[in-house]
Regions:
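Boundary/junction segments of secreted and surface-exposed precursor proteins
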Residues: 30-35, 72-76, 311-343, 502-534
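N-terminal zymogen propeptides
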Residues: 32-75, 169
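Aromatic- and Gly/Pro-enriched, solvent-exposed loop/edge beta-strand patches characteristic
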Residues: 371-456
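Predominantly the structural core of cysteine protease catalytic domains
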Residues: 67-74, 78, 94-102, 114, ...
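Short, composition-biased motifs enriched in small/polar/acidic residues
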Residues: 502-633
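N-terminal secretory signal peptides that target proteins for export/translocation
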Residues: 1-14
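Acidic glycine-/aspartate-rich tracts in secreted/extracellular proteins
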Residues: 99, 106, 146-150, 227-230, ...
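Short, surface-exposed beta-strand/loop patches at domain edges
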Residues: 429-502
Length: 633
């Protein structure tokens, strides 16, 4: 007999996993022998499992080297940055993710960079104490929405350097982060445009080769492991228990011939992974590097990941998306038990409104299958808040291809699509090929708040025999159902990337006559005047470049009363060669409550509306009118 609502069963399990996660997340120390060290990996409430497509060799871009070498060390190629020290906080996941990005920059000839782990940990936006830990899914969400990566010099880990607090001085370290020096949203130094997910290790040569191929191709992979209770000897570590992962580290190589006799507890055979830890250079006997046995029962068992920075061709101006928290859940057919939604879901779509004159240049999509054929369609001038994402629209572009790996992929369009100011457009993703039941990725209300509205995100299945496609709105909670009396919504994991074509209506260099000229500034998703969780300082960034490529300056005013100039918050924005810088006056202190006067869905004639500050941090895109002025640096 078919269960009445299998989605409710799955969701309740996820809810129980969330409760378990919250109860255990505060434990962020690993006991190894007589020593205690901070860890910080926490499993997501719902396990997103990637799958290997039929006939696919692996989910990475496999190198053609056959066979794989018996050993590899990315340090030999100059691809690894120095070992860092997370002590005494549970932030290992940010160190693992940033270490991978730093390796990509070295590998591609862009030099050595030191990225900020503190900024990612404090501004991830997920539920729970930031010291409770994280995972690759959380890192992906933070990076793909362009909240990072940020330079260490712009938001240092500790004022006196890493390791300045002892392993038991967590309270003092947290006080510095939360009170003395909270993080604020910053313009990212690098945009992340791709995430490669590597299949979990399961003891087979096939999955072992998947990870080896990823290491050779990308130099480093962020992995999860169990470090509490690990038997250690010298620089060799081995865990053979059944407890869950509690630590995130970076794997940079392997050695098939690493002797089993090197381990305190002898594993069944030779071979080990070479990893870079985040406990400083005095950790172990190899300067903070370790060898973890191939036979470790927990190493590499939670969606290992590679984070790829944008190439110069991918350095887009703005990102649109409602999936602020990334791939939290996978949307499949059995999640909805409401006629006529019985066919496998193979469609998802998002609807956006352009903030100014710009060109749609690329789209981005999450995928859980190692090889997945797709069709992407772009519709312009679609009807807002319609039953389908294509209603009233004109097909502007259609592109087909195959996603070659699990994770997130940015797909450039064959040619940019011009978007006039306030154009409503949709991105429609359709699975093609034989495996149309591949789960669709979405952000849900699990350990985060996506704040989705009707008419923004859709899921559906393709019509057959001439029938129309069937769609449901991801914010239609009557259909999506409820979890223990809590409404949930599903935001499709689809993004749109644009290049700006707006030009100044007057001079665009300080000193020329630009006073009083109006323009629209698109303030990107999570960095857009987002209310800082720790303190009362607002941060924002905008991309406004003049017709001749020179700097365009702008002010934006906000306060309790827009008619009172003494109650205004002035934000000055400068963009030089595509890199924005900010200044604002006055500093917002804890003594006052500020309401942000912004513009939501700006009509042609303007029309200001009140936007409470506590709503800004959960809003996907918001656009503000700014006034150009003759500002000087």
């Amino acid at each position: 007999m078919k269960e009445k609502n299998p989605y409710r069963r799955h969701a309740k399990k996820a809810f129980l996993r969330l409760v378990a996660m919250i109860c255990t997340a505060a434990i962020s120390m690993a006991a190894v022998g007589d020593d205690v060290r901070p860890t910080g990996f926490r499993p997501p409430p719902h396990r997103i499992k990637i799958r290997r497509a039929e006939g696919a060799k692996d989910s990475t871009k496999r190198l053609k080297a056959t066979p794989l070498p018996s050993s590899w060390d990315s340090r030999d190629h100059g691809w690894v940055t120095p070992v860092k020290d997370q002590n005494p906080l549970g932030t290992c996941w940010t160190f693992a993710a940033n270490a991978v990005i730093e390796t990509q920059l070295l590998r591609t000839g862009r030099g050595a960079w030191d990225l900020s782990e503190k900024n990612m940990a404090l501004l991830s936006g997920f539920e729970g104490d930031w010291n409770s830990g994280g995972n690759n899914d959380m890192a992906s969400a933070h990076l793909l929405r362009w909240s990072g990566a940020v330079m260490e010099t712009n938001d240092v880990y500790f004022t006196n350097g890493e390791g300045s607090y002892g392993k038991y001085e967590v309270a003092s370290a947290k006080r510095e982060w939360e009170t003395t020096r909270p993080s604020v949203p910053l313009d990212p130094t690098f945009h992340i445009q791709h995430v490669i997910l590597v299949p979990d290790l399961d003891g087979t040569e096939e999955t072992r080769n998947d990870l080896k191929s990823a290491i050779m191709e990308y130099g480093a992979v962020a992995v999860a492991a169990r470090w509490t209770g690990t038997s250690q000897q010298g620089c060799s570590a081995y865990y053979n228990g059944s407890s869950g992962c509690d630590h995130a580290i970076t794997v940079i190589g392997w050695d098939d011939n690493w002797p089993a006799s090197n381990f305190a507890i002898v594993p069944p055979g030779n071979g080990a992974w070479l990893i870079k830890n985040s406990w400083g250079t005095n950790d172990g006997t190899a300067g903070g590097y370790w060898y973890v046995s191939y036979h470790d029962t927990r190493f590499g068992t939670y969606n290992s990941a590679v984070f790829i920075p944008a190439t110069p061709e991918e350095n887009y101006t703005a990102v649109y998306g409602y999936d602020k928290f990334g791939c939290i859940y996978d949307f499949v057919q059995e999640h909805v038990d409401n006629p006529p939604y019985y066919d496998p879901f193979d469609l998802m779509a998002t609807v956006f409104t352009s903030g100014w004159n710009e060109e749609l240049a690329a789209v981005g999509v999450y995928n859980l299958l190692s090889s997945s054929p797709y069709e992407i369609s772009i519709y312009t001038n679609v009807t807002r808040n319609a039953e389908t994402p294509t209603t009233g629209g004109v097909l502007a572009c259609q592109v087909t291809g195959t996603l070659s790996h699990a994770g997130f992929t940015t797909i450039p369009l064959p040619a940019p699509i011009p978007l006039a100011e306030r154009t409503t457009f949709s991105v429609v993703y359709r699975q093609t090929g034989s495996e149309r039941s591949n789960p669709l990725c979405c952000t849900s209300d699990y350990y985060c708040y996506p704040n989705l509205n009707l008419g923004q995100s859709y899921f559906g299945y393709s019509g057959t025999d001439g029938e129309e496609d069937v769609w449901i709105d991801g914010a239609n909670k009557e259909i999506i159902n409820k979890v223990d009396s809590t409404d949930v919504a599903w935001a499709a994991c689809l993004k749109a990337y644009t290049h700006t074509t707006v030009t100044a209506k007057a001079g665009d260099t300080p000193g020329e006559t630009a006073d009083g000229t109006e323009a629209l500034a698109a303030l990107a998703a999570t960095n857009a005047l987002a209310y800082a969780q720790h303190g009362e300082t607002f941060g924002a960034f905008a991309h406004i470049v003049g017709a001749n490529g020179r700097t365009l300056w702008a002010n934006w005013l906000a306060g309790l009363d827009p008619s009172n100039p003494n109650d205004d918050f002035t934000l000055s924005i400068a963009v030089t060669n595509g890199v924005p810088s900010l200044s604002w006056t006055p500093d917002l202190g804890d003594a006052r409550t500020y309401t942000i006067w912004g513009c939501r869905d700006l009509p042609p004639a303007g029309g200001w509306s009140v936007v409470p500050k506590d709503k800004l941090s959960t809003t996907t895109n918001r656009f503000f009118k700014v006034t150009l002025e003759n500002s000087q640096p």
